[in-house]
Amino acid sequence: MQAATVVINRRALRHNLQRLRELAPASKMVAVVKANAYGHGLLETARTLPDADAFGVARLEEALRLRAGGITKPVLLLEGFFDARDLPTISAQHFHTAVHNEEQLAALEEASLDEPVTVWMKLDTGMHRLGVRPEQAEAFYHRLTQCKNVRQPVNIVSHFARADEPKCGATEKQLAIFNTFCEGKPGQRSIAASGGILLWPQSHFDWVRPGIILYGVSPLEDRSIGADFGCQPVMSLTSSLIAVREHKAGEPVGYGGTWVSERDTRLGVVAMGYGDGYPRAAPSGTPVLVNGREVPIVGRVAMDMICVDLGPQAQDKAGDPVILWGEGLPVERIAEMTKVSAYELITRLTSRVAMKYVD
């Protein structure tokens, strides 16, 4: 009997990379594999995508794991380096790094490195999180062009704040700031992540940085799913029924007795709970698939178990397969029901969930 298991479909992952190339045919791809590849497994994901032009991570430790695992493609530190003492490692491993503040720039100017570092200057075009403000950007850029530890030319990167809101006007403003600054500068340019790839073709430039859409999940909050853009779900969260019980009308289920059956029915108990990373906030009615058909969760999600209403005529039995999200049940639907973003759902699964890779 299978307990909580994440099944990762390598074929779907490769399909999605190819689909994104179709959407941004003139751009190179930074496959973003931060946060354990959005819960899909850092090394296995990178090894599944040998055709990616580069990989993007948030931490130096992630980049080093890629190198130790045999990944030789360029690796971009999306948030840059956090300690000047990391610069010799970044140089020796030929990592690319974002540079977004005075402290990082000063560290580059003062370092003694065997080889220069490939730098992506981060311009704050409107996210107001990381990046050099436009009024300070020319002077910052000039110092990078004069720094002996920076491989020339300097590349330029930014990030959209509201790419998933095509009518708000913010993305057009960010693009205008980005284009104005980049004009006449020789480096590579990148501003589009998942939302930019899907909705803003004028933002694709030299490199795009697909994150969640690479894994077949829509970045948009408009009830769209990855399949709407030709992508396939890569992750399926699965488990099994561990019991099937006769349940009488009027009887409550689970902690607090929050759900009471209006009819005689059969309940299934699934080996899955918030101890596995399934959202405790999932209300009664949240769908799961049992033997390929949708049934609702009933009662509270517990640490190790959830209950589902199989229906009075159900023939399901202990050991039968359950899909919590994935093939046939998009994680975006679970996000909508639970009010927990799909980003969080797929990245917060716990260490006791087994990982299985299939082709």
Curated annotation (Swiss-Prot):
GO biological process terms, semicolon-separated: cell wall organization; D-alanine biosynthetic process; peptidoglycan biosynthetic process; regulation of cell shape
Lineage of producing organism: Bacteria, Pseudomonadati, Pseudomonadota, Gammaproteobacteria, Enterobacterales
Active site: K34 (proton acceptor), Y255 (proton acceptor)
UniProt subunit comment: Monomer but homodimer in the presence of the substrate.
Residues annotated as binding substrate: R129, M303
Family statement: Belongs to the alanine racemase family.
NCBIfam families recorded: alr (TIGR00492)
Cofactor: pyridoxal 5'-phosphate
PROSITE patterns, alphabetized: ALANINE_RACEMASE
Protein name per UniProt: Alanine racemase, biosynthetic
N6-(pyridoxal phosphate)lysine: residues carrying this PTM: K34
Gene Ontology molecular function: alanine racemase activity; pyridoxal phosphate binding
A Pfam family this chain is assigned to: Ala_racemase_N
Organism annotation: Shigella sonnei
